[in-house]
């Protein structure tokens, strides 16, 4: 009942945030704020943003030790490195297929819906500054950055991919050492349970954070920003909705009828990701939801962190729409071959860049330059990026939950055959040491 109440509270907070943000903007700015009124709105938004920032920092505080603990325990109970390699290859195969699905669907929809054609609003000058730091987009630097020089630094920076690399080495070494490393496995199990309990405490703040995040987005920007780019936003959300349907059909194909109940189990983390515009904020709850659904923790603890770097289906859809929308807005014709090559470039360059701030915009900016498109076009979508980030973050959670479920099925089934009742999340009572 507590989990259902929390979901209800988050929905109420979402609606209240929309109303309060909208009313505050209109009451202070009257639709066309003076410099003083704009400063007042910015100050209100700043205080609201503080609440969201605190919540997201508390979530990030949990992620590093939780990823480390669950992954080490999961690898230790796999029993051999062959199983680890098999799960890794199956995960990457699914990630690539899901990315291609997102790109293809996005490409088709952009041509059908034409979100940028005949855009009736002034375009930014082609040389306008975007404040996007492309120096962070260096393929050699990105590949080098995957490997940690210090696990302390990786955890301090909350770099999931580096934590995964260290945890894999640590877990494999524990398996090789055998019984002498058993105390370390028990310590990792205890760490996981403690972090899940902390997650339960932090999530009680979720409704307040959701209210602040949504109100903050509307207080400063106002409702008119949605109207100006409403059709583009509608097109993106149509694409995300169709992607949900297609991923759901694939889940039905590989997981069976139980895939329908998966959406009930992940509804809370999906709602958190949507409201906070952060798939990272939903990571701990997604891990718990998959555990209750029956995905062995040795699978979910490996697939989910990898998915946060390599399986961002919602972000792939958004980048497809944004890139081709900008080309259409400037009246630049790209032949089909160029478009396909550009989208494949997006797919390759987006892998492993999740730790970069505003990662999607960095990838889009670099890709636009490579294909001689005006980088300034990003300014068109920047104003509504937060509202689109809500949808793509929720989609990323759905995509990774389905990925973990499918890989679990490929690895011999989802246990138990009858999922646990949807109840208040807590540290799994069956223990992570039971071979799951």
Regions from the PLM with identified roles:
Residues 58, 96-100, 237, 241-242, ...:
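Hydrophobic transmembrane alpha-helical segments of multi-pass transport and channel proteins
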Residues 76-83, 118-119, 177-182, 190, ...:
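Juxtamembrane helix-boundary/capping and inter-helix hinge elements in multi-pass membrane proteins
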Residues 2-3, 7-11, 18-23, 44, ...:
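Signature of multi-pass transmembrane helix bundles
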Residues 268-350, 404, 416-428:
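Helix-loop-helix junctions within the multi-pass membrane cores of secondary transporters/permeases
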Residues 357-423:
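Hydrophobic alpha-helical transmembrane segments of membrane transport and translocation systems
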Residues 66-67, 206-209, 278-286, 299, ...:
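Transmembrane helix boundary and interhelical junction motifs in multipass membrane proteins
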Residues 40-47, 85, 187, 223-231, ...:
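Membrane-water interface of transmembrane alpha-helices in multipass transporters/channels
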Residues 60-61, 139-140, 158-163, 199-204, ...:
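Membrane-interfacial loop-to-helix junctions in multi-pass transporters
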